[in-house]
Design a protein with these regions (language model features):
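Flexible, glycine- and charge-enriched loops at secondary-structure boundaries
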Residues: 31, 35, 126, 166, ...
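Charged (often Lys/Glu-rich) extended helix/loop segments that serve as interaction or gating elements
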Residues: 262-290
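Active-site-proximal beta-alpha core segment in soluble small-molecule metabolic enzymes
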Residues: 57-193, 197-199
Length: 290
């Protein structure tokens, strides 16, 4: 569904990929990334995040945690990644990118928690329950620091992809925060969900999910309990044109992924500031029957 958009909005990239393939410099069955455009897209996202007071972490899994991709993103000022699993953390770490957020969507396995803390020291570590919070805090204590813990929360009516369900009950967030503050090596830092924004096929627009309202209510409950500096992590279908709305809803963190290479569903519907900058290269192997 992106081919027409790619050819119209970034034709020189398509032509360059074809030329390099014809010169046998890029094989068939390859993904090709326009690193110059990635850097430009990342710069747009970073600028809009800064304008709205949002911390920004780059999602890199969609392009295989490519080190060249990571370096282009860092060149635009986005210095930290969100690692949905240890593979992401290792890949971005090797590329020289610090891990800003670890453990969301995949929880860090108990046997890998110590290595995650010692090697990556993520700014934030998401946990879905008290057991995982204890493991993260214990690992951080062994590594000699206090880990900022984000709590994945949920409420009735929230929307999750299959296999992504779970988290602390949003109604219990104040008590959860108190418990996490009691962990050696850990401290409660804030709340998260996924997805906070989602493309609506009927209206062909990106809309807030019920999850974003859940985050807002939980943040209000924490503020009413006297807590300040609450981090609100709100990923999902992120483009620069949506950041102002996220900030107005109370978000403090955003995590663009497909937006960095201009391939969210909204990029198909509208010409957004980010241009498409990734393609799959193949070739016609032979003709048969005319």
């Amino acid at each position: 569904m992106f081919l027409d958009i790619l050819r119209r909005r970034n034709p020189k990239f398509v032509q360059a990929a074809m030329a390099l393939h014809r010169d046998s410099k890029i094989p068939a069955n390859s993904y090709v990334i326009d690193l110059d455009q990635v850097r430009a897209n990342a710069s747009t996202l970073k600028g809009e995040a800064d304008r709205n007071g949002l911390k920004i972490f780059a999602m890199t899994k969609q392009v295989g945690r490519s080190s060249s991709f990571c370096k282009a993103v860092m060149g635009a000022g986005i210095e930290k990644s969100v690692a949905v699993d240890m593979a992401c953390a290792r890949g971005t770490h090797r590329a020289g990118m610090a891990v800003g957020h670890l453990g969301h969507l995949s929880q860090i396995a108990r046997a890998e928690a110590d290595a995650a803390a010692a090697t990556f020291r993520p700014d934030y570590w998401t946990v879905f329950n008290d057991t995982k919070a204890g493991e993260a805090a214990s690992a951080a204590a062994k590594a000699g620091y206090v880990q900022n813990l984000l709590t994945r929360i949920k409420a009735d009516g929230d929307t999750f992809y299959r296999g992504h369900e779970g988290g602390f009950d949003a109604d219990d967030i104040v008590a959860v925060a108190d418990r996490l503050d009691g962990l050696e090596g850990g401290r409660f830092a804030g709340i998260t969900t996924f997805p906070a924004l989602l493309f609506d096929h009927e209206s062909r627009k990106v809309k807030p999910t019920p999850n974003l309202s859940t985050l807002t209510r939980a943040a209000e409950a924490l503020a009413s309990a006297g807590r300040t500096g609450i981090e609100v992590n709100a990923p999902g279908t992120t483009s620069s044109v949506l950041m102002e709305g996220l900030a107005q809803a109370g978000a403090t963190q955003c995590e663009p992924g497909n937006g960095i290479h201009g391939t969210t569903a909204l990029h198909v519907m509208e010409d957004l500031p980010e241009l498409p900058s990734v393609l799959y290269l193949t070739e016609v192997s032979h003709l048969s029957g005319g």
